A protein has these predicted regions:
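Extreme N-terminal basic, low-complexity initiation segments
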Residues: 1-13, 17
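N-terminal export leaders
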Residues: 9-10, 34-35, 53
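Intrinsic-disorder-associated, low-complexity terminal segments enriched in Asp/Asn/His/Tyr and depleted
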Residues: 27-28, 52
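C-terminal alpha-helical cap/extension of soluble enzyme domains
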Residues: 74-82, 103-105, 114, 263-266, ...
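Catalytic alpha/beta core domains of metabolic enzymes, predominantly
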Residues: 193-194, 205-304, 309-312
Length: 363
């Protein structure tokens, strides 16, 4: 019943905008003007404005009706993989997980884009999954990346994660080989039917070269193990279509899109900036959930420049690793073919961190 009410609400107010929203940039940075007088989608779609806290709380409650994997709502952090002398630095990795546990995050997501999974060997990938589960020790959920452009390989990694004790698996769309929508459906279906843990479909067409269309995601939602969507297309329209038709737990895959996505029924974020300031991103989500839109807007504005430069100065995870080193939490260099941040960009990032109020070591 809750899902039916939520779907009716979203269908009434979200899909029929008067005009298209501004397109996202390559790095999916959503314009701050979206929030100047309340989310544009509210202004275009609602017959009356939300004017008081009671109305806001009612509005928030409608958007937050139970979704399929509600235990993953909130802040998840896309973990970096620390290296030392070219090898995985297990000690520093455990330290980063302890840092997130103390911050009270909902979930950690190792071996994804931020964790440099494309440059890990198969053995290293499995080792990071196992170390994550061991270090988390039940203090937070663990959702490792297990995707591949080979369905058989994705199934193997997902089965390993499930056997190791992962709470869910984050499965990126197949990259490089550009399957059809039917191929994408069959890929995720095969993975979902191979394990008994929830699957989060990760849609990031800027990296994979193929968008998983809303119609395909809606088809996938009919499968019991498909429970979540990591939404990194930059399209509010696409997210709205999925939210209106399914009870999937939708998580933002772009830090700067967290508040816009929450505003249409998203339930949280898988965050890169959470490696630096998990408390602020967690506070943004909690403020929205409590109906304190003014505080949520303030935190969005505070985080915006930091989020923009972590995703815009160079390919992720180059800037986040540089930033962590600058504030005294060094996780080593990135692996080739990625290279360290160039000096002028490093100087800019150092200034961004200092302006944010983070303790930056001198160059």
């Amino acid at each position: 019943m809750a899902f039916i009410l939520r779907r009716r609400f979203l269908r009434r107010f979200l899909p029929r905008h008067a005009s298209p929203l501004p397109p996202a940039t390559e790095n999916h940075i959503f314009p701050w003007s979206f929030f100047r007088a309340g989310p544009a989608i509210w202004r275009q779609s609602r017959p009356v404005a939300v004017r008081d806290s009671a109305q806001m709380q009612t509005f928030g409650a409608l958007l937050q009706m139970s979704t399929r994997a509600e235990q993953f709502a909130g802040l998840s952090v896309a973990m970096v993989t620390p290296f030392r002398d070219g090898a995985i630095d297990t000690r520093r990795f455990h330290e980063q997980i302890d840092f997130q546990a103390k911050a009270g995050v909902t979930c950690i997501c190792p071996v994804g884009t931020t964790g440099e999974s494309p440059t890990l060997t198969h053995d290293e990938h499995e080792r990071v999954i196992a170390e994550s589960i061991q270090a988390a020790a039940g203090r937070m959920l663990v959702m490792p990346g297990t995707g591949s452009n080979s369905t058989a390989e994705a199934i193997r990694l997902t089965k390993f994660a499930a056997k190791a004790g992962a709470n869910a698996a984050l499965v990126v769309g197949p990259y490089y080989n550009r399957p059809t929508q039917q191929g994408l459906y069959e890929h995720f279906k095969a993975i979902a039917e191979s394990v008994d843990i929830p699957i989060c479909v990760y849609n990031i067409p800027a990296r994979t070269g193929r968008n998983i269309e809303p119609e395909t995601i809606i088809r996938l939602a009919s499968l019991p193990r498909i429970a979540m969507l990591k939404e990194a297309t930059g399209s509010i329209d696409q997210a709205s279509q999925v939210l209106a038709a399914t009870d999937l737990t939708v998580l933002s895959g772009d830090d700067s899109m967290t508040l816009p996505l929450l505003a249409i029924g998203g339930r949280g974020v898988i965050s890169v900036v959470g490696n630096l300031v998990p408390a602020d991103m967690k506070a943004l989500i909690q403020a929205f959930e409590k109906g304190d839109l003014a505080k949520a807007r303030m935190l969005h504005g505070k985080l915006f420049t930091l989020c923009r430069d972590l995703l815009g100065l160079a390919s992720n995870p180059i800037p986040i690793k540089a930033a962590m080193a600058m504030i005294g939490r060094d996780t080593g260099d990135v692996r080739l073919p990625l290279v360290s941040l160039e000096a002028p960009l490093a100087d800019k990032l150092r200034q961004v961190l200092a302006d944010y109020g983070l303790p930056v070591a001198k160059a």
